[in-house]
């Protein structure tokens, strides 16, 4: 298993647009990164008073599903209430943003989310992006804190990481499964004027 060397810049945790991206074969995105980032995120949430649900979505990149498992090991060990998509289905980024916003409308606790995706990066890459309670991507004032702490955790050999065994994930009282897609699709009709599109006589080739 490739292990990151924190003395090599491109193997450290490095947040770009709200998240860390990298490649497992280049030691820039592997289990150690996910363990460190997730623990750092748990600590950030606690310090920021974010005590609600952590929504977690994945995309179709090969590294996304195993990264979600690792993240859940840490979130659940830290007693963070988590929601994942039913049947491990995929969650587009706009769906995650919508889900976070809707969940905060009638909640006394702040809810946020993670999208495990490297976006448009190559198939071999993985990514881990954090969306704050406003539904949008986290800004540098947030990511800089998480990045710094994650690299400290890596440098210290992951000693501060709390995690549960993989086989105990789905037995945890802190884990729920949910349908993220259906509420989003149903809401589209209230946001987009479908009749204008219908009457525009557009011809689209796919």
Features from the language model and the residues they span:
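Glycine-rich phosphate/diphosphate-binding loops that line cofactor/substrate pockets in enzymes
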Residues: 38-54, 193-200
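Short, highly selective alpha-helical patches that border small-molecule cofactor pockets
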Residues: 34, 38, 64, 68-72, ...
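Cofactor-/ligand-binding subdomain signature composed of acidic, glycine-rich
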Residues: 1-32, 36, 152-156
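Short, glycine-/Ser/Thr-/acidic-enriched flexible segments
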Residues: 20-22, 61, 89, 119-121, ...
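N-terminal small/polar loop signature for handling phosphorylated ligands or for N-terminal nucleophile
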Residues: 50-125
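Phosphate/oxyanion-binding active-site loops and adjacent basic polyanion-contact surfaces
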Residues: 29-39, 63, 88-92, 177-187
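Short glycine-rich or small-residue beta-strand-to-loop segments that form or flank ligand, phosphate
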Residues: 23-24, 53-59, 203-206
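Gly/Ser/Thr-enriched, mixed-charge loops and adjacent short helices
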Residues: 1-11, 107, 126-206
């Amino acid at each position: 298993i490739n292990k990151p060397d924190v003395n090599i810049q491109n193997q450290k945790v490095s947040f770009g647009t709200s998240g860390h991206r990298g490649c497992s074969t280049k030691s820039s995105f592997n289990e150690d990164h996910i363990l460190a980032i997730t623990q750092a995120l748990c600590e950030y949430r606690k310090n920021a008073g974010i005590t609600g649900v952590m929504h977690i979505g994945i995309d179709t990149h090969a590294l996304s599903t195993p990264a979600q498992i690792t993240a859940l090991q840490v979130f659940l060990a830290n007693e963070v209430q988590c929601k994942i998509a039913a049947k491990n289905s995929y969650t587009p980024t706009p769906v995650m943003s919508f889900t976070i916003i809707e969940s905060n409308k009638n909640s006394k606790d702040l809810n946020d989310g993670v999208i495990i995706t490297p976006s448009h990066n190559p198939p071999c890459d993985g990514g881990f992006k954090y969306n704050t309670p406003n539904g949008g991507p986290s800004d540098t004032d947030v990511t800089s804190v998480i990045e710094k702490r994650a690299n400290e955790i890596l440098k210290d050999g992951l000693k501060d990481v709390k995690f549960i065994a993989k086989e105990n994930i789905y037995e945890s009282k802190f884990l729920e499964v949910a349908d993220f897609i259906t509420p989003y699709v149903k809401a589209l009709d209230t946001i987009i004027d479908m009749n204008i599109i219908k009457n525009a006589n557009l011809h689209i080739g796919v």
